[in-house]
């Protein structure tokens, strides 16, 4: 599953292996490399010299008497894996025995005096018997058809003859092998059999031309020369000519084009069409299973289901496994089958399908300390006498069908139930289906004709979607082997996605970084705690490297078939890997290896002559010596190995002498002369269909040279129409359960999909995100409609091409009116991130906070919804119609808490959930209000508060309101968090709440952290920064009066006597919550956010406006949004090294204007009818508030919050301290805090203070709250889990996890400088949180050695870069001298980000759909009105931007692939949006101005004038456009160009001609039309920018009016 690099070669090498001088005296010889093609090594893949041992694992065997057996003509597969890069190459080998004759006296002179004379003299002359091989290697291998193979040995009983007494004949093993990066096993095998047949046929043809020479000797000669045993110069010109053409055939085969996954197939004609059909090479697209070109169910047949699952358990749990068998083919394919069966997991350790017996020191690989899967021949351990098998290796004997456990093996855990029973049932059904007489559904010939069986397909679809998943029945696929393989893989995927195995896996992963490669932490403890049934198997599986790597791979998966299976798509026609299911949908490339003008055609047409003379070997072995070379024919395996050991086989890596061709002079003549048509043949032939079917036509069309192939690139001709028809039929059948979708809708989607990816139908691409729905055991208890949505693939899409249905929301939000029309969120591109449209696999009590935890990493959250692909965007109206869905917009939110139970519980009604959630929030608001007013929590409320705070989202909700720091926009960008003074009464109430929160965190930790524990960062920030002073005058002050501390003033004195400050703090916005229509449970929070990932515009009758207590004059002033959200503190975006974490409160401005269009990043939802722009910080209040804090209800049109610097999960950011330390020092400056009592001291059990204080403390304590220090602080796993949760939240807040697939793709496309900047951002985020983690652990008096160990482990786990890791190490080095509050808290990077959001309408007026356009640091994000990311336009892709103040329309030109697209938006704040984007782009350009120059202006392009047909050059210069043709030259000045655009490959230029005062249109046909248009637009932008800057310099400053 590793993303493999594209290899431009279909075949890397073709080699011939055997013995150059076969010996009749020994059973086995050292195998030698006899021929290799090409002669030179490829730079990135030299030919490994030990390939000879893999081709002949037990040596080059020889035998005297031939006995035909299944091993006489065999093929098998091996792999060669590069130990440095991990790249795997496949070897496909065909082994056969060619006969040779013992050296006779008359042959001594045969060598002549040539350079190989001596060698030839010792070479035994052989009469070739290879042409007689026709037996198959078993049911799994298919050599060529009977008509293409000589049949001399087809009837051994009738072929028995006595041998001539003067001939003692031997046969020697010979191997033909192909090495390739591509696993086309069956087709490569056919190529090798074809090569063998060509040599055999040429040998047969020579029999009639040399009547004086015995037939056997003459037939021998061809193979002896081909294998290098005889000199070329001595042989006849006819033989050399044949060999030359055979070698030219090999080189043409090596130059075959490579198929493109999901787009192009290659049809290779290796022999004339009437002799053998063309071989098809095709790769499935990523939405299908990866190609497995062998019987994957083979281990199930050989071992049985139970034993096979036992071996799979060993493999999954990382035990060492060795398989052995006499049959190489069964051995290697079984190993590869086991590896393929664990998909979507990947085996992370060495895999060697075939380890040769005769290779020296091969047994040392079995001593490796790591797990492995290795296949060895049955002779391996007998041959390695001195080797002792390690006592921890599981041995699987495929011949005896036994699994032998090692001596000290631990007992394998049994697979969990009921999943195990289901898996066994499905596997047995799949195997049983092969014994039935039912016909397979799909027919290969009909597929090539573009036909299908819609009746069966439709029935399958209806059955599939109307029955529970446990009714899965592989019999529906028919009884063909390929469908059984698909059924086997489907059963395994469904097993992994079951509740007791890996379902819900991604809920427990935390993305730590994406660049330079993804790093994901897997929280195994919470994962195991979420299993419905605790099993040893799941516990051990969770600790394996395969599961850990799966978390990284799933961020940007290279294959999506498992997601389609999770969405109940099982049909092989949709997910199958074999070309017969999809080849008809691909563009064909026809390539001819065989030249019909070659004289090889004559040899192929000669009927094989079979007489008694031509069969010198008795198949029955009935003459004097009953001796066979095959190990299977020995009385025992030991006898065979004993004979092998008598032979002198050198198993060391051989030193290969430079080889030559058998007859061909130089390969270059083949490559240049013969393959030139491939470069030119881009257009389809005039009648490519006929040229395939009619040999005379093809022959006449390729009249170049006798050895030159005619390479034909077929056009689409009639196939696209047929494949569209197939797609339509398939789509119609599949979408039958969705009656509202007319066939025309799916058809339009099919057409678009074909043009995009070449795959038949977008309707087939319906896979949900992994591990969401329960697949095994009892079905989840849900409402019928919700379960239907969860299990029903949605293929519908608007006929107009809109993407409205691609914008997902939880199923509970889907209303009955639009659930059918709602489509999947995935784009049709194979590389698109796949988003899930269901949250039903996990518990019903989901809230604002928990959803972020659940969705943070890939495609779960709205923030990560797939962006549309090119095809999805190219519509007449580029934006979807979102009208009609607005009722569902309420409560659409990103999640904060990712953990939740996997097993579903019966949820209460939506009204009940919404009511409970609102009541809980309102209750906690009142408690917080009471605390901030100095009235405390209250004895009667304490029990309920404790119970409610067991929910992480409610913990964050309360902590966000407790944090009492006021900030301005400038304060938000400061680095150090200021202390906050509160009154003693407020202190007491806050301490009670914090202690309740700690108790609830203890409860969460006891349940393995389910629900998340990042709130501890917010709690400890409050504890470290909030204090009361013991001075008498300060003890009489108001509870929250002094929170606003201006920079440079003593925090203890600032704000005194300021009534407004008191009013602000006393009136947090505690309006009642809007009832949630879709709450997941009683603890749900109805939260909304302008956050980049999760903006939600909620409109509807359920929304209740908040209640404000402020007077009219106060409404217009800046207020503290007490319920603004909090987000995790993280790395600062600033460049100075000491930028640190803190939190900032959302400042809310309530505007009385109904037309207000400014809203600065609040945690609130904007009214959908108002035209707003939000100056949103990416931090806590805006970004973070979306994650962790519950905000007040939706604002009305006039209630818009502004908060440019937003709060974080840790509460609000505090005012800057009067004295800042230099950036190099992490330690806080010393100050007089002797009279201050901080909240953290109460958490530790305060040991200072008067007796009166202690008595008062005791009186304030409740029976349920302990004064002692919690033991939670000593649990290192708790700190690790809290850190991982915090990283996830901060990444969400900074927009680092919005569509990880797109982010990774962009990273790979950037230059080195930009990549480094992105890596630095991630390092800074991680270092900031690690710094704060150290500070909090110090605060709670954690053992300092434990701090060092844990932080260093987390630092290594996060792969923090050298610069930032050095900073953390410096802090750890000073740890001995640090205590308590000595280490300052760094502010979060999310709070340093500033984003502005504007409400826009698609099109030129307000009739267009509403979108929210967010202007970020490096891109513009377009969100739908439910907060889903619709588009993300990176600044490097924007070409031009203009606006019209009169029409209020903004025009954006952007580069989309190779095309330039124009998008128009209407907004009342058109001018502000324009300058906002312009300023942001200028800042982005300034970051790389000195390092990365922009693209050069202008360029030259070939064009053809549409009027005259004349060709020429179009030059774009700074002065204008210059057109050069053969007979004339035209120059068009820049100021005369009125318009330019492209229309289907035609560049249209409109020129204003001053002489005639008219506009003249010029049209030029060119394949570079888009490049020309792009170049002209860049030129206009450049000229406009230059003129603007010049005007600014000339314009004098205006006098200021008095």
UniProtKB/Swiss-Prot annotation:
The modification Phosphothreonine is found at residues 1040, 1045, 1194. The keyword Cell membrane applies. GO terms for molecular function: guanyl-nucleotide exchange factor activity. GO terms for cellular component: axon cytoplasm; cytosol; membrane; plasma membrane; synapse; synaptic vesicle. Residues 157-166 have a biased composition (Basic residues). Residues 105-167, 603-635, 676-840, 870-920, 1030-1089, 1113-1231 are annotated as: Disordered. It is found in: Cell membrane; Cytoplasm; Cell projection, Axon. The modification Phosphoserine is found at residues 155, 688, 691, 778, 812, 817, 819, 857, 861, 895, 900, 909, 1038, 1089, 1196, 1225. Residues 13-267 form the uDENN domain. Its main location: membrane. Residues 1295-1370 form the Death domain. Interacts (via death domain) with TNFRSF1A (via death domain). Interacts with PIDD1. Interacts with YWHAZ. Interacts (via death domain) with KIF1B; links the motor KIF1B to Rab3-carrying vesicles in anterograde synaptic vesicle transport. Interacts with KIF1A. Interacts (via uDENN domain) with RAB3A, RAB3B, RAB3C and RAB3D; the GTP-bound form of the Rab proteins is preferred for interaction. This is MAP kinase-activating death domain protein.
């Amino acid at each position: 599953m590793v993303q493999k690099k594209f290899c431009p070669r279909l075949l890397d090498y073709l080699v011939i292996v055997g013995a150059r001088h076969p010996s009749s005296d020994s059973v086995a010889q050292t195998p030698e490399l006899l021929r290799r093609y090409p002669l030179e090594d490829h730079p990135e893949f030299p030919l490994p010299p030990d390939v000879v041992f893999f081709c002949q694992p037990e040596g080059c065997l020889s035998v005297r008497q031939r006995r035909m057996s299944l091993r006489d003509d065999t093929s098998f597969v091996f792999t060669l894996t590069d130990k440095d890069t991990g790249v795997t190459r496949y070897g496909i080998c065909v082994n056969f025995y060619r006969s040779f004759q013992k050296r006779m006296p008359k042959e001594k002179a045969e060598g002549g005096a040539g350079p190989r004379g001596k060698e030839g003299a010792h070479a035994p002359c052989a009469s070739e018997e290879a042409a007689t091989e026709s037996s198959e290697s078993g049911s799994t291998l298919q050599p060529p058809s009977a008509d293409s193979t000589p049949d001399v040995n087809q009837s051994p009983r009738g072929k028995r003859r006595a041998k001539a007494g003067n001939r003692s004949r031997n046969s020697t093993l010979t191997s033909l092998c192909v090495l390739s990066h591509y696993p086309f096993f069956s087709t490569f095998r056919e190529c090798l059999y074809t090569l063998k047949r060509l040599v055999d046929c040429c040998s047969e043809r020579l029999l009639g031309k040399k009547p004086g020479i015995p037939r056997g000797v003459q037939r021998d000669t061809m193979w002896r020369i081909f294998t290098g045993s005889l000199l070329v110069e001595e042989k006849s010109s006819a033989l050399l000519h044949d060999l030359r053409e055979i070698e030219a055939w090999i080189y043409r085969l090596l130059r075959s084009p490579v198929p493109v996954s999901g787009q192009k197939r290659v049809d290779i004609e290796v022999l004339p069409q009437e002799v053998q059909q063309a071989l098809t090479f095709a790769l499935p697209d990523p939405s299908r299973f990866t190609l497995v070109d062998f019987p994957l169910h083979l281990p199930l047949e050989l071992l049985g289901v139970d034993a096979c699952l036992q071996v799979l358990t060993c493999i999954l749990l990382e035990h060492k496994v060795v398989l052995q068998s006499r049959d190489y083919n069964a051995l290697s394919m079984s190993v590869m089958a086991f590896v393929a069966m664990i998909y979507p997991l990947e085996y992370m350790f060495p895999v060697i399908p075939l380890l040769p017996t005769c290779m020296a020191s091969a047994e040392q690989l079995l001593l490796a300390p790591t797990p492995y899967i290795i296949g060895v021949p049955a002779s391996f351990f007998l041959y390695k006498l001195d080797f002792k098998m390690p006592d921890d290796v599981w041995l699987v004997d495929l011949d005896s069908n036994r699994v032998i456990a090692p001596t000290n093996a631990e007992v394998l855990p049994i697979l969990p139930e009921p999943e195990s029973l289901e898996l066994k049932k499905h596997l047995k059904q799949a195997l049983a289906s092969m014994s039935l007489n039912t016909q397979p559904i799909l027919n290969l010939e009909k597929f090539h004709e573009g036909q299908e069986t819609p009746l069966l397909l439709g029935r399958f679809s209806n059955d599939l979607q109307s029955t529970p998943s446990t009714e899965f029945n592989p019999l529906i696929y028919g009884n063909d082997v390929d469908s059984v393989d698909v059924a086997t893989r489907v059963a395994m995927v469904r097993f992994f996605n079951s509740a007791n195995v890996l379902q819900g896996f991604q809920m427990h992963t935390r993305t730590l970084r994406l660049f330079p490669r993804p790093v994901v932490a897997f929280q195994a403890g919470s994962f195991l705690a979420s299993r419905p049934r605790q099993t040893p198997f799941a516990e051990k599986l969770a600790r394996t490297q395969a599961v850990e790597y799966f978390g990284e791979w799933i961020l940007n998966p290279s294959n999506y078939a498992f997601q389609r299976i999770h969405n109940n798509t099982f049909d092989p026609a949709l997910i199958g890997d074999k070309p017969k299911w999809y080849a008809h949908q691909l563009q064909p490339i026809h390539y001819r290896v065989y030249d019909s003008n070659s004289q090889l055609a004559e040899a192929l047409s000669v009927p094989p002559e079979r007489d008694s003379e031509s069969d010198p070997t008795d198949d029955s072995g009935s003459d004097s010596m009953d001796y066979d070379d095959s190990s299977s024919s020995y009385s025992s395996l030991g006898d065979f190995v004993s004979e092998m050991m008598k032979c002198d086989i050198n198993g060391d890596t051989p030193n290969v002498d430079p080889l030559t061709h058998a007859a061909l002079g130089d390969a270059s003549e083949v490559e240049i002369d013969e393959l030139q048509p491939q470069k030119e043949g881009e257009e389809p032939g005039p009648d490519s269909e006929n040229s395939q079917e009619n040999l005379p036509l093809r022959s006449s069309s390729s009249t170049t040279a006798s050895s030159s192939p005619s390479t034909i690139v077929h056009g689409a001709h009639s196939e696209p129409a047929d494949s569209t028809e197939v797609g339509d039929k398939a789509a119609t059948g599949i979408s039958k359960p969705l009656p509202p979708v007319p066939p025309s809708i799916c058809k339009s989607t099919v057409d678009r999909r074909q043009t995009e990816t070449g795959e038949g139908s977008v309707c087939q691409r319906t896979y949900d995100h992994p591990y969401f729905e329960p697949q095994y055991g009892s079905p989840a208890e849900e409402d019928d409609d919700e379960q239907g949505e969860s299990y029903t693939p949605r293929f519908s899409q608007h006929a107009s091409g809109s993407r409205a249905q691609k914008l997902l929301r939880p199923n509970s939000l889907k209303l009955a009116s639009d659930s059918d029309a709602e489509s999947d969120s995935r784009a049709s591109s194979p590389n698109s991130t796949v988003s899930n449209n269901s949250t039903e696999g996990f518990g019903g009590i989901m809230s604002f906070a928990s959803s972020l935890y659940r969705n943070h990493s890939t495609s779960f959250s709205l923030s990560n919804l797939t962006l549309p692909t090119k095809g999805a965007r190219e519509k007449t109206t580029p934006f979807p119609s979102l009208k009609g869905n607005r009722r569902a917009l309420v409560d659409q939110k990103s999640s904060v808490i990712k953990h939740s139970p996997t097993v579903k519980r019966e949820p209460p009604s939506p009204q009940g959930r919404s009511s409970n959630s609102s009541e809980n929030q309102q209750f906690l608001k009142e408690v917080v209000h009471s605390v901030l007013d100095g009235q405390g929590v209250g004895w009667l409320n304490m029990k309920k508060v404790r119970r409610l705070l067991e929910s992480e989202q409610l913990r964050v909700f309360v902590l966000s309101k407790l944090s009492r720091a006021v900030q301005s926009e400038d304060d938000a960008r400061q680095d150090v968090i200021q202390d906050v003074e509160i009154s003693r009464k407020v202190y007491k109430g806050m301490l009670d709440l914090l202690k309740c929160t700690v108790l609830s965190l203890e409860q969460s930790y006891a349940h393995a952290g389910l629900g998340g524990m990042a709130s501890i960062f917010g709690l400890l920030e409050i504890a470290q920064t909030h204090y009361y002073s013991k001075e008498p005058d300060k003890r009489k002050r108001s509870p929250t009066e002094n929170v606003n501390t201006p920079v440079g003033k003593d925090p203890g004195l600032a704000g005194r006597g300021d009534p407004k400050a008191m009013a602000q703090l006393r009136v947090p916005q505690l309006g009642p919550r809007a009832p949630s229509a879709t709450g997941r449970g009683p603890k749900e929070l109805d939260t909304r956010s302008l956050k980049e990932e999760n903006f939600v515009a909620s409109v509807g009758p359920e929304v209740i406006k908040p209640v404000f207590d402020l007077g009219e004059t106060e409404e217009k002033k800046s207020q503290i949004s007490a319920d603004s959200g909090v987000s995790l503190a993280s790395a600062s975006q600033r460049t100075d090294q000491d930028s640190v974490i803190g939190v900032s409160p959302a400042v809310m401005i309530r505007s009385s204007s109904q037309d207000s269009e400014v809203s600065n990043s609040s945690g609130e939802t904007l009214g959908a009818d108002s035209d707003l722009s939000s100056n949103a910080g990416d931090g806590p209040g805006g970004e973070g508030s979306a994650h962790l804090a519950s905000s007040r209800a939706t604002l009305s049109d006039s209630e818009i919050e502004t908060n440019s610097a937003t709060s974080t999960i840790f509460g609000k950011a505090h005012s800057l301290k009067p004295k800042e330390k230099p950036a190099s020092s992490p330690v806080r400056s010393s100050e007089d805090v002797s009279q201050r009592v901080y909240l953290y001291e109460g958490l530790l059990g305060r040991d200072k203070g008067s007796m009166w204080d202690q008595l008062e403390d005791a009186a304030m304590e409740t029976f349920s709250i302990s004064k002692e220090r919690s033991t939670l602080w000593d649990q290192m796993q708790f700190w690790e889990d809290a850190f991982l949760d915090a990283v996830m939240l901060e990444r969400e807040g900074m927009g680092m996890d919005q569509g990880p697939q797109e982010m990774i793709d962009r990273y790979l496309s950037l230059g080195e400088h930009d990549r480094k900047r992105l890596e630095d951002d991630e390092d800074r985020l991680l270092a900031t949180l690690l710094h704060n983690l150290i500070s909090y652990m110090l605060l709670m008096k954690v053992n300092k050695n434990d701090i060092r160990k844990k932080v260093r482990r987390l630092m290594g786990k996060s792969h923090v870069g050298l610069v930032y890791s050095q900073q953390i190490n410096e802090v750890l080095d000073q740890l001995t001298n640090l205590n308590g509050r000595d280490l300052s808290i760094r502010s979060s990077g999310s709070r340093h980000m500033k984003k502005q959001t504007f409400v826009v309408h698609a099109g030129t007026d307000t009739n267009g759909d509403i979108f929210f356009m967010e202007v970020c640091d490096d891109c513009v994000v377009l969100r739908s009105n439910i907060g889903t990311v619709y588009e993300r336009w990176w600044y490097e892709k924007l070409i031009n931007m203009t606006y019209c103040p009169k029409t209020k329309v903004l025009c954006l030109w952007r580069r989309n692939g190779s095309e330039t697209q124009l998008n128009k938006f209407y907004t009342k704040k058109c001018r502000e949006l324009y300058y906002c984007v312009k300023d942001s782009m200028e800042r982005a350009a300034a970051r790389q101005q000195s390092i990365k120059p922009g693209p050069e202006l202008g360029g030259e392009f070939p064009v053809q004038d549409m009027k005259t047909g004349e060709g020429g050059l179009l030059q774009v210069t700074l002065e204008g456009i210059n057109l050069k043709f053969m007979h004339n030259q035209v120059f068009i000045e820049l100021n005369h160009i009125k318009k330019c655009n492209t229309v289907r490959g035609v560049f249209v230029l409109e020129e204003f001609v001053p002489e005639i005062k008219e506009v003249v249109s010029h049209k030029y046909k060119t394949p570079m039309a888009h490049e020309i248009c792009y170049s002209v637009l860049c030129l206009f932008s450049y000229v406009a920018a230059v003129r603007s800057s010049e005007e600014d310099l000339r314009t004098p400053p205006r006098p200021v009016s008095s």
